[in-house]
Amino acid sequence: MKKCRITVMKVARYDDLIEKYENPIQHACDMKEGQVFIANGWERPEGFCLSAWESMSAFVLTLSHGGGDFYDGWMKNKKSAMISCNDGFRPVSFLIEALDENAE
């Protein structure tokens, strides 16, 4: 099983939607563009958002086991995926890449 690098590529915030539809929350997303996490196979990286992990864990698991080429040629690099979390108010886009390094 291989490790995967997860890089925060884009962080968006839709204040108009937040103001109109969201109840106030105590802790909003604190991901920063350029932030990098290493997934040790199927394990969620320490400090990584649980909701974002639930959106991407199947892709990480597939890549860590040598799979890829999602959706018949979707990504230029077949050992990668571009996934966003499911927060419609503050979506974050992540690049997931399989590494050559084995998971522990």
Language-model segments: what does each one mean?
Residues K2, R13-E22:
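Short, structured beta-strand/loop micro-motifs enriched in basic residues and often containing a Trp
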Residues M1-K3, D30-E33, E101:
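A short, structured loop/turn motif at beta-sheet edges
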Residues K20-R44:
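Short, flexible N-terminal segments of the mature chain
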Residues D15-L17, F48, A103:
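Intrinsically disordered, low-complexity acidic/polar segments
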Residues R44-S55:
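Short, Lys/Arg- and Gly-enriched loop/turn segments at beta-strand edges
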